[in-house]
A protein has these predicted regions:
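C-terminal capping/gating helix-and-loop segments adjacent to ligand/active sites or protein-protein/ligand interfaces
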Residues: 129, 303, 343-353, 363-416
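Hinge/lid segment of periplasmic solute-binding proteins
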Residues: 90-145, 171, 196-202, 284-288, ...
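Short, solvent-exposed loop/beta-turn-alpha elements that line the ligand-binding surface or hinge
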Residues: 108-120, 162-163, 205-227, 277-280, ...
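Glycine-centered hinge/linker elements that transmit conformational signals in sensory
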Residues: 171-176, 214-246
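A structural signal for short loop-to-beta-strand junctions that line the ligand-binding cleft
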Residues: 76-77, 84-85, 116-152, 183-184, ...
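Conserved N-terminal structural module of periplasmic/extracytoplasmic solute-binding proteins
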Residues: 6, 21-96, 100-101, 112, ...
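Extracytoplasmic/periplasmic substrate-recognition and gating elements
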Residues: 49, 53-54, 58, 80, ...
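Extracytoplasmic/periplasmic solute-binding protein
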Residues: 131-139, 144, 169-217, 233, ...
Length: 416
């Protein structure tokens, strides 16, 4: 009888514990852009499943395809009080309406209670809102950096550039490469001068002020733009670009690099796919660093992480959901989970992403991205199409001395 009573009491206690666990579990309303047609949909579903299994919580997934209609609905939901608990959204000006309305919680406020929140991220690569605070935990994005042909460099006795690569080292390497009969820089200045323009502007400024657009022809931003154009001119005059850089297409100069006739190519993360499909041997290529000059380090690059996870005020102020929301974002942005979402994309992870199954060039990109200390978006994106077109059309005129760099900048900003 005593044994039976003891068994019954134990069963009641277990049932009670189960009831408490069920009562403590919550359902989070989550909205992301990982809709059905997104390439990372399966990775997102796997991460959500792991979260649910590890916490006992449930996720009401409101993900959809990222488009203007989706963005408008997200903003409308905040206006009507129908916002989710966790939102994966753009971190640029698109987020300002709900940030300025106090509808999301800052990273600092979250860390006051959860000190380890998002500490696996580089603060310098986290988006800053208009009020100077950070609100989102970043995911991944694009990068622009320098591809190198290792076979060419080896034949010239030149080392693959590291994150401390300097402008003086670069100029010396270019001279060595040129003397060996190779083209140092693969680039069509008539079609894609913008890659070099971005980095030369940053080399004459800082990553912090890279997105400053000239307001007049004689302000500080205009001066660094002109200095950047003059650096491109100096490279042209030294004979470091292809002989046909003013007439060749981008495809032609990229193939020059791919064929082992040129050493350096500045391009973006999207170009990795091209070489994966077209390179004879991916081991001949690597992602390195654009040489630094002045205050810019070679470990600072052009790129962008345009989206991140926000915790809404609604979830934060709900005692039942606060911890659940923090844990959800922490899991979705952990080193392990975020690594499943990327191949070569840049992340803000302190330790860098560790994606699996990468080919040699993809692995090289992942290794390089792990050393990136800061990124800035492309300043050309802040220009009108007319101003941008005029500026880049004049690059060939600047390098050939038909127009001064200062006049080219003044002419472009007059159209902006």
């Amino acid at each position: 009888m005593k044994k039976a009573l003891a068994f019954l009491l134990a069963a009641v206690m277990l049932l009670g514990l189960g009831t408490v666990a069920m009562a403590d579990s919550v359902t989070l309303n989550v909205v992301t852009s990982y809709g059905g047609d997104d390439g990372n949909r399966a990775n997102f579903e796997a991460a959500v499943k792991a979260y649910e299994e590890s916490t006992g919580n449930k996720v009401n997934d409101g993900s959809a395809t990222s488009n203007e209609e989706w963005k408008a609905k997200v903003l409308t939901d905040f206006e009507t009080g129908s916002e989710p608990d966790v939102l994966f959204f753009f971190t640029n000006a698109d987020a300002e309406p709900f940030i300025s309305a106090g509808k999301v919680v800052s990273i600092d406020e979250i860390r006051a209670e959860y000190p380890d929140f998002a500490t696996n991220m580089k603060s310098s690569m986290m988006a800053v809102a208009a009020d100077g605070k950070q609100y989102s935990v970043p995911s991944s994005g694009y990068w622009e950096n320098m591809f190198v042909n290792k076979a060419v460099l080896a034949d010239c006795g030149v080392e693959v550039p590291g994150p401390d690569y300097t402008w003086d080292q670069f100029l010396a390497d270019c001279e060595t490469i040129k003397a060996a009969g190779y083209t140092p820089i693969a680039c069509s200045l008539v079609e894609v001068p913008h890659y070099w323009f971005e980095f030369m502007v940053m080399n004459n400024g800082t990553v912090a002020n890279h997105l400053d657009v000239p307001a007049s022809a004689d302000d500080a931003a205009a001066a660094k733009w002109a200095a950047g154009l003059n650096d491109i001119k100096a490279l042209y005059e030294a004979g470091y670009f292809p002989a046909n850089t003013l007439t060749a297409s981008d495809a032609e100069t990229v193939e020059l690099f791919n064929a082992g006739e040129a050493a350096f190519l500045i391009d973006g993360s999207w170009k990795v796919g091209y070489f994966t499909q077209n390179a004879a041997d991916l081991n001949d290529f690597a992602i390195a660093y654009v040489p630094g000059k002045g205050e810019r380090s070679a470990s600072e690059a052009i790129g962008g992480i345009s989206m991140g996870y926000f915790i809404t005020r609604k979830a934060w102020d709900d005692p039942a959901k606060r911890a659940a929301a923090v844990e959800f974002v922490s899991q979705l942005t952990s080193d392990e989970v975020l690594s499943t979402f990327v191949t070569t994309e840049v992340t803000a992870l302190v330790n860098g992403a560790s994606p699996a199954g990468l080919n040699p060039l993809q692995q090289s990109a992942a290794d390089a991205n792990a050393n990136i200390t800061a990124i800035a978006g492309a300043v050309q994106d802040l220009l009108t199409a007319e101003a941008r077109g005029d500026l880049f059309a004049n690059v060939q005129n600047v390098v050939t001395g038909k127009i001064s760099a200062e006049d080219a900048v003044a002419q472009a900003i007059a159209l902006n």
